[in-house]
Design a protein with these regions (language model features):
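N-terminal leader/targeting and pre-domain segments
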Residues: 1-29, 115
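Glycine-/small-residue-rich active-site loops that bind phosphorylated ligands and cofactors
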Residues: 39-40, 68, 97
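Non-catalytic, surface beta->alpha helical segment in thiol-disulfide oxidoreductase systems
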Residues: 83-115
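Conserved residues at beta->alpha junctions
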Residues: 35, 64, 100-103
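Thiol-based oxidoreductase modules, predominantly thioredoxin-like and allied folds used
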Residues: 33, 56-73
Length: 115
């Protein structure tokens, strides 16, 4: 689990409200929703860390175990069809695209997030 924390160290920890704000304001932003206790999230975080190191992309992280975010996150996940973690969310022009696939390759991550 320490490796997970190391893998997400270059991500910007944020809240569900920030993701909704990006949608509402038609920003372009990418979010990783996950938790350190999820083996699939740990796998995805390792691949994502390599992409971030290579591209210097700004990716946001929403901790799905953050007690203060549970209600908001549940509503957000329900509203936008994010059934499981890891949830990889890319927002552009008020549209949201979601992938929940821990086996995404580095190239798939880059393609999905437009990196």
């Amino acid at each position: 689990m320490e490796q997970f924390l190391d893998n997400i160290k270059d991500l910007e920890v944020t809240t569900v409200a920030r993701a909704q704000e990006a949608l509402d304001n038609k920003e372009t932003a990418t979010f990783f929703i996950g938790r350190k206790t999820c083996p699939y999230c740990r796998k995805f975080a390792g691949t994502l860390a390599g992409v971030v190191a290579e591209t210097k992309a700004n990716i946001y992280f929403i901790n799905s175990e953050e007690p203060s975010q549970l209600k908001e996150l549940q509503e957000f996940r329900s509203r936008y069809g994010i059934p499981t973690v890891p949830g990889f969310v890319h927002i552009a022009d008020g549209q949201i695209n979601v992938r929940c696939d821990s086996s995404m390759s580095a190239q798939e991550i880059k393609d999905f997030a437009g990196l």
